[in-house]
Amino acid sequence: MPTPADDLVVIGKIVSVYGIRGEVKVYSFTDPLDNLLDYRRWTLRRDGEIRQAELVRGRLHGKVLAAKLKGLDDREEARTFTGYEICIPRSELPSLEEGEYYWHQLEGLKVIDQGGQLLGVIDHLLETGANDVMVVKPCAGSLDDRERLLPYTGQCVLSIDLAAGEMRVDWDADF
């Protein structure tokens, strides 16, 4: 039975074909990159369309993965899979240590500074060379209408309360 769409987590994206035997090139959002290959059953999603796929094999190829899906044996057929997000049920993600979070858990949290001012909500995160960056967008009740980029570091993030939907930060609202 397929998993409801709101219970899915995107772990990668099919970006193009690979070779002539129906393999696809995959950009992985997992760390390390080849962790995506641990999941054999994929839910593929693109423009509201959902389909199921089964991974037969895959390998790391530079900064992307080459993957063979069951029943996909032709380059032109593989091309039709380009652009699909690769999703798995949240329940299949491994448990994390205390104080560690998946990005999807942080998205949507209200961001509050030390003075109690609402800066906005975390829209998404960016991976940079030094540290991850939270993109905080204004929301109803926020201090102003500015978008902010905050580092996801121990120095900036003071506390995270998933149940309350809040993150407390040490951040000057003028930045």
UniProtKB/Swiss-Prot annotation:
Which keywords fit this entry according to its UniProt record? Chaperone, Cytoplasm, Ribosome biogenesis, rRNA processing
Major subcellular site: cytoplasm
The entry's localization annotation reads: Cytoplasm
Note what the entry says on domains.
The PRC barrel domain binds ribosomal protein uS19.
What are the PRC barrel domain coordinates in residue numbering? 97-175
* Listed InterPro entries: PRC_barrel-like_sf, PRC_RimM, RimM, RimM_N, RimM_N_sf, Transl_B-barrel_sf
Purpose of the protein: An accessory protein needed during the final step in the assembly of 30S ribosomal subunit, possibly for assembly of the head region. Essential for efficient processing of 16S rRNA. May be needed both before and after RbfA during the maturation of 16S rRNA. It has affinity for free ribosomal 30S subunits but not for 70S ribosomes.
Q: Which GO terms describe its biological process?
A: ribosomal small subunit biogenesis; rRNA processing
Q: Gene Ontology cellular component?
A: cytoplasm; ribosome
Protein name according to UniProt: Ribosome maturation factor RimM
PANTHER family (alphabetical): RIBOSOME MATURATION FACTOR RIMM
Oligomeric form and interacting partners: Binds ribosomal protein uS19.
Q: Give the source's domain of life in one word.
A: Bacteria
HAMAP family per the UniProt record, alphabetical:
Ribosome_mat_RimM (MF_00014)
